[in-house]
């Protein structure tokens, strides 16, 4: 699948530590291979129709949408902060 990033995702990415970015890159590789990759625990967010959340690490989450053959990355960061503003 093709992956694109929103401006908000790009900004949030810059705020991550190097260690968090490494975990994020691994999660993105898994996401591009298979949205249902078990470690991601990807699921649709409650109260939204098209937004998904996935686990990057124990404390990090990312949100995304799927449009055809494209994954649109929306946000990444701390669990609560990211899921409050998907």
Language model feature labels by segment:
Residues 1, 13-15, 32-34:
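Short hydrophobic/aromatic-rich motifs at helix boundaries and adjacent loops
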Residues 2-11, 18-22, 55-86:
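Enriched for short, Lys/Arg-rich terminal
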Residues 17-21, 45-48:
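Short, structured coil/loop segments at alpha-helix boundaries
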Residues 29-54, 83:
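A short, surface-exposed loop/turn module that caps and links secondary-structure elements
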């Amino acid at each position: 699948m093709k992956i694109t990033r929103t401006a908000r995702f790009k900004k949030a990415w810059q705020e991550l530590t190097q260690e968090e970015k490494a975990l994020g890159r691994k999660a993105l590789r898994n996401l591009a291979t298979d949205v249902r990759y078990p470690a991601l625990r990807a699921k649709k967010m409650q109260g939204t129709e098209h937004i998904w959340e996935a686990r990057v690490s124990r404390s990090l989450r990312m949100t995304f949408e799927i449009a055809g053959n494209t994954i649109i990355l929306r946000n990444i960061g701390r669990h609560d902060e990211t899921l409050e503003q998907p």
